[in-house]
Curated annotation (Swiss-Prot):
It comes from Caenorhabditis elegans. This is Histone H2A.V. The nucleosome is a histone octamer containing two molecules each of H2A, H2B, H3 and H4 assembled in one H3-H4 heterotetramer and two H2A-H2B heterodimers. The octamer wraps approximately 147 bp of DNA. H2A or its variant H2AV forms a heterodimer with H2B. One of its GO terms (cellular component) is nucleus. Expressed in somatic gonadal cells. Pfam families: Histone, Histone_H2A_C.
Length: 140
């Protein structure tokens, strides 16, 4: 029986099915197999990880990535540029309260978030310290 065929060289009726990745089965873009391998490497000595754990982890990572990229895209659109930079990622993460608590890492090239404390701001009508007419600046 050459070539895996049945009687008289005819096909047995079964067509070879294409290999479908676990990412495609789950409807994800992130690689489920690779994440499963990484999870097995990082666990205890037995290296046993459930099959659905990798799918779930890939789905979580994909969701978080999509969320950050959407916010960074909005930040770049607000600044009227077409390319997302580390600065846009930084603004997106620090601008979202939940992502800010989740991601505490320093982003290289992200800069800082502009913030001036309320106490340092001038009140309307109040003289600015150091200028003539400010309290404590008169002749003594």
């Amino acid at each position: 029986m050459a070539g895996g065929k049945g009687k008289a060289g005819k096909d047995s009726g079964k067509s070879k099915s294409k290999v479908v990745s676990r990412s495609a089965r789950a409807g994800l873009q992130f690689p489920v197999g690779r994440i499963h391998r990484f999870l097995k490497q990082r666990t205890t000595s037995s290296g046993r990880v459930g099959a659905t754990a990798a799918v779930y982890s890939a789905a979580i990572l994909e969701y978080l990535t999509a969320e950050v990229l959407e916010l960074a895209g909005n930040a770049s659109k607000d600044l009227k540029v077409k390319r997302i930079t580390p600065r846009h990622l930084h603004l997106a993460i620090r601008g979202d309260e939940e992502l800010d608590t989740l991601i505490k890492a320093t982003i290289a090239g992200g800069g800082v978030i502009p913030h001036i404390h309320r106490y340092l701001m001038n009140k309307k009508g109040a003289p600015v310290p150091g200028k003539p007419g400010a309290p404590g600046q008169g002749p003594q």
